[in-house]
């Protein structure tokens, strides 16, 4: 594990991991980092009630800087979340109510907290909310003190909004157009409040970050820096962090630890070593050694298991990881005796297909309702051919009717057809 990375070459180490997309004045920043600890920030807008995988790389980057002795500021956008960032978005965002945004702010702040250390002396993390400075600011102050420093000519040339300005069907509202000023002022404000000298963010944030750098120079005559992390792509060109069911969330109530773990297990060989560099704190030498070992082992690579274990532990803790592994193991070997009621709740949430049934239903009905079989006739043949298990036990009687002993924790019955097709019956 890398502990305190030497600060002066921290940028180099991030580059070796493929974690730097763009950086302003790299030499001056490296020099500034070599002089001693700095404060840096990353902003998270509450656009939903949870962060998702796309937020993980910048969040872990804050952690990497903190491990190297720097002071991270996690900014939750209580104000910017009310406006909506138009950067590279094809259409105007729906405005959310103040109550909703406030609720999301609280959830996201709680989600960010475990990744950073808020009690470690000089470089303890700080949680900030931009509603604190924008909430009471009036429009004249905004236009005179902030707006005066922004050139519309430059703003309309920013890549992030260009596509919206050039389309007749999807223009951009004044609300979203002014987002750039808000994020710019955040940087200037945090520079004044906490001496923040660096902003990090996803590569789509470059335009907002450079605006903040200019504004900080104009308002406070301070030189500050920006660094963006790349947008994560997969080798096959498909979007990272999405499954058939949508985004992969960090909130266990939205994506269960089991589903989260499985997401990483299913990483392609072409991506897995790169992802170990992005999403874990393993030493690069260790990752390269693992790649070498996988290449020469003649067996299935071990890297996916290492990745799944590391990231699940980071996000869901030891307990979440243990549950995910326990469920994975039980489904693989068909022995459900180790599963807890909470494990079944994870499976019902998003782990395997799930149906609800009234008590008194028979096995054939369950196979048809669960779409494990197209018809009762086909189900009858499948059961008779010994291809169906109930809670891991073979059941070859086509006339079988479920009994209370089949209902684990009084509620759950796991059906399997063949090797891999599962359905969880939840009894009403």
Swiss-Prot record:
Enzymatic class: ligase
Annotated EC: 6.1.1.1
Pfam families for the chain: SYY_C-terminal (PF22421), tRNA-synt_1b (PF00579)
Recorded family membership: Belongs to the class-I aminoacyl-tRNA synthetase family. TyrS type 1 subfamily.
Keyword Cytoplasm: yes
Compartments it resides in: Cytoplasm
Source organism superkingdom: Bacteria
Motif ('HIGH' region): 46-55
Positions with a binding annotation for L-tyrosine: 41, 179, 183
Residue positions of motif 'KMSKS' region: 239-243
GO BP: tyrosyl-tRNA aminoacylation
TM region(s), chain numbering: none
Binding site for ATP: 242
GO molecular function: ATP binding; RNA binding; tyrosine-tRNA ligase activity
PANTHER family: TYROSINE--TRNA LIGASE, MITOCHONDRIAL, TYROSYL-TRNA SYNTHETASE
Catalytic activity: tRNA(Tyr) + L-tyrosine + ATP = L-tyrosyl-tRNA(Tyr) + AMP + diphosphate + H(+)
Organism the protein comes from: Klebsiella pneumoniae subsp. pneumoniae (strain ATCC 700721 / MGH 78578)
Lineage: Bacteria, Pseudomonadati, Pseudomonadota, Gammaproteobacteria, Enterobacterales
Alphabetically ordered keywords of this record: Aminoacyl-tRNA synthetase, ATP-binding, Cytoplasm, Ligase, Nucleotide-binding, Protein biosynthesis, RNA-binding
Start and end residues of each S4 RNA-binding domain: 361-418
Subunit organization: Homodimer.
Protein name in the entry: Tyrosine--tRNA ligase
Biological role: Catalyzes the attachment of tyrosine to tRNA(Tyr) in a two-step reaction: tyrosine is first activated by ATP to form Tyr-AMP and then transferred to the acceptor end of tRNA(Tyr).
A GO CC annotation given for this chain: cytosol
